[in-house]
Amino acid sequence: MKKFLVFILLILSANTYAQSGNESLIRQRLKQQTESWNRGDIEGFMETYWKNDSLLFIGNSGVNRGWQNTLNNYRKGYPDTAAMGKLSFDIIMVKKLSSKYYYVVGKWMLTRSIGNLSGHYDLLFKKIKGRWYIIADHSS
């Protein structure tokens, strides 16, 4: 009986580690996003997004599809480093939906000399070829 209990505890702890490991990887991807943004590197910022025509982005201008369209919209909305400012995220929740999907809710803040901006976001991450990518973004 003791061996069985030890076995169950090992399985449960391994599952917890895997969950926290994936959450840590997703948090790292978001950290990479802010670092790229704060260097003025929109293309680097976009590396966290799924480079696919099915990427879904919902923002102030409505529903947009596709990685290239999303990149173009970011370039149009943030043409220089003054407009980009410094980005920070406050991650409110990271929730595992399955072994391949995580849901993230948070707040974004832009500190800028031309006026600060802030809002909330929810993201759907999918594990694709061993890496976590944003496949849907709703930012307001």
Regions found by a protein language model. Name each.
Residues 54-65, 79-82:
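A short gly/proline-enriched turn/hairpin at secondary-structure junctions
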Residues 4, 8-48, 69:
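Short, low-complexity N-terminal intrinsically disordered segments enriched in polar/charged residues
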Residues 50, 61, 93, 107-108, ...:
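A mature extracytoplasmic/lumenal domain signature
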Residues 33, 45-46, 54-55, 70, ...:
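Hydrophobic pocket/interface hotspot
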